[in-house]
Amino acid sequence: MRKFMDEDFLLTNETAVKLYHQYAKDMSIYDFHCHLSPKEIYEDRRFKNITEVWLYGDHYKWRLMRANGIDEKYITGDADDYEKFVAYAKTIPMAIGNPVYHWTHLELQRYFGIYDLLNEKTAKSIWERANEVISQEDFSARNILKKSNVKVVITTDDPVDSLEYHIKLKEEKDFDIKVLPAFRPDKGLNIEKDDFLSWIKKLESASGIKITTYDDFLQALEKRIEFFHSVGCRISDHALDYVFYQKTSKQEAEKVFKKVLTEQHLTKEEIDSFKTYTMIFLGKKYAELNWVMQLHIGAMRNNNTKMYRILGPDTGYDSIGDFPIAYSLSRLLDSLEIEGALPKTILYTLNPAANYVIATMIGNFQDGKIAGKMQFGAAWWFNDNKDGIKEQLKTLANVGLLGRFVGMVTDSRSFLSYARHEYFRRILCDLIGEWVENGEVPNDIELLGKIVQDISFNNAKEYMGV
């Protein structure tokens, strides 16, 4: 019987052990999609206790606690931090088989040197020992990044953001981790949302352009893209809860924009017309600047209206959508390709039923010039588990080039989430090792070791170009 989470955790064969320990383990991290706060990195945030660093803002953990019958008071409410920690400690033993169970114990091991299982009995001891580590001078946002061997952090940023802290970090000479912005213009595309007009006012202020026409709007977006580029941004990110496409023209998009400025009702066709033209406009600009475009497809968000009104978005009430994506995605990408303006693109799906749709779609638009130009993004969110990661890797390998994969992202608000890169690398090495043991790929450790290192770091660095 294997020991729980020992040094060969998730490594079930000799080749996997060799690949992980000799090739993957010590590779740096290139985190090209996360939700860390650049302000907290710049200010080198320190934490009061383990609840603050671990449970604040972590809706993965919140969902489990709710499922365990924990009252909201102990999740997002006014209970004190120790009470919240104990509530989580009561929950985690019920979560065996869930990646959060593994991440919890990996983080305790890697950042606190604690190898005990977290439960109600050990909660007090772990609370005290973890907080002792947190109280040390070297436990801070920047030092956690250094300890995790992170070389690049790419945050998620609204086009109206000042990027104040990215600029300050860029100017620092003694901090050698790159902290770069990503351009996330969802609020500029979601014309049907209640906050669209108020966001336009923010865009006016940020761009210095008075927006009274669709041309003004596009010019303001373009100006913000150029500003982001000047600060080091080389990647955009779009949350496509559904994949829109409507055969359209600039004139049609202009009409829709005029209607929304006068607060008239929009049809779905009008909404999709506006989104399609605007998205194509943005894609062309990304291609011109050699940016990467990320499309996160398939989340069904804010399902619980009652809790959304109380807590707002990103609080644990999202799930997987099941709408068709193939046709609209094909037409959207093709519209850019026709004009020679399809940027490097990473497609993520939240619905694993669409794995083969995405993995085969990228093959339609590889250009024979940029290796791995079109990417099937890492297993995302609800798929970020052992089975989900393996399925994404196997699907990509079955119909594409695994060796060109740009690898894992944390997609997290937590500074401790870099343990997820270790989790991913162990699963990657185990899968390749399994193929070797079965005689499905050659036992060429140098070839396989290079592929593992490339997926762990090198491919992402080359692909992003920064």
Swiss-Prot record:
Pathways per UniProt: Carbohydrate metabolism; pentose and glucuronate interconversion
Known catalytic reactions: D-glucuronate = D-fructuronate; aldehydo-D-galacturonate = keto-D-tagaturonate
Source organism, top-level taxon: Bacteria
Transmembrane segments: none
Keywords noted in UniProt: Isomerase
Gene Ontology molecular-function annotations: glucuronate isomerase activity
E.C. number: 5.3.1.12
Pfam families: UxaC
GO BP terms in the entry: D-galacturonate catabolic process; D-glucuronate catabolic process
Record carries keyword Nucleus: no
Gene3D superfamilies (UniProt xref): Metal-dependent hydrolases (3.20.20.140), uronate isomerase, domain 2, chain A (1.10.2020.10)
Family membership: Belongs to the metallo-dependent hydrolases superfamily. Uronate isomerase family.
PANTHER family, alphabetized: URONATE ISOMERASE
Protein name: Uronate isomerase
Lineage: Bacteria, Bacillati, Bacillota, Clostridia, Thermoanaerobacterales
